[in-house]
Amino acid sequence: MLGGLLAICSAACFAFNNASVRRAVLTGSIVQGMAITVPIGVPLFFIAALVTGNLAAVMGFSPTALAALSAAGVMHFVWGRYCNYRATRAIGTNLVAPIQQFNLLVTLVLAIWLLGEYLTPLKILGIALILLGPTVTMQKAKAAPGERAVSDEKITPIDAEKPAAFQPKYAEGYIFSLLSATGYGLSPVLVRVGLENQGIGVSLAGGLVAYIAATAAFALVLLWPGQWKHVWETDREAAKWFTFSGFLVFFSQMFLYMAMSVAPVTVVSPINRLSILFRLFFSRLLNPQHEVFGGSVILATVVSLLGAVALSLSTDVVQSLLPLPESMVTLLNWRWP
């Protein structure tokens, strides 16, 4: 249950981050955003590990663990984030979200193949419900493409401007959505390998390693001519929201790494998908003038939360709470592979 709760906290923070990034890219570029949101994780995780007394754990990681955590950082914070930003800019969040569900399948397949984890009927039900929740929302939005429920609220002067008609670049958006799914799908498995079941505290040290590797990798991008000048020209409004996003990403990843250290990937990753639903609420709060809002949000939220509960509950807990017939007990105890 703890792993599931931490995964939900991670999903909420990640969704808030998405809404913040959406505001930032109204006046800032992808490179400018990554130049702020990637490096900011290093001092934040350093402080968290130092305060909790887990900084020394960095030196205790095996070479394999260091390699796995470093690879996770590059795949998630650099590759996945860049592709996600590109896809969102090309086709918008509503079209990106259902395509990125592919990363869940990548994670589950790799977890079963490499980590020896398994599926149970409860996990399969939970996965199905979590995938169904966002699908309900996306299908509803697709059914009424002409509707655009936009709030009259004005948060900044940018909101006073009527947004231009959005022309999706489908090829670019779909390609980068799938590419981001590979990064986001592979990184949880690498984190699980790197943490080696060492507990919540050590996960903070693992996050520090991942962010250092990601920052070093992204620093190579800034060596390209003109990139440093471009970053220093970041708009003040964009810099504010990118910085806020960086803090939200830190909390999101901190909760995620803690969840991965105490719960199976097959539980944490699907629950983390709830961020797709949370972002609709945060978008309404932060971006009333710059997002498209569909219906069926409450239904989708309830369906996905039921899936999260199914994933968090163990078979033993269900059997202790409900008087089940022998045939049902046998079904619940089924495992694959």
Residue map of PLM features:
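C-terminal transmembrane-helix exit sites in multi-pass transporters
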Residues: 105-125, 135-137, 141, 277-299
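Membrane-interface interhelical linkers
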Residues: 1-32, 36-71, 81-91, 139-176, ...
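Transmembrane-helix signature of multi-pass solute transporters
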Residues: 43-48, 106-110, 129-136, 216-220, ...
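Hydrophobic/small/kink-forming positions within alpha-helical transmembrane segments
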Residues: 15, 46, 73-78, 104-109, ...
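Membrane-helix interface/capping residues of multi-pass secondary transporters
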Residues: 30-31, 93, 119, 200-203, ...
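Structural signature of transmembrane alpha-helices in multi-pass secondary transporters
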Residues: 10, 41, 100-103, 180, ...
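Residue-level recognition of transmembrane alpha-helices
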Residues: 37-38, 100, 123, 127, ...
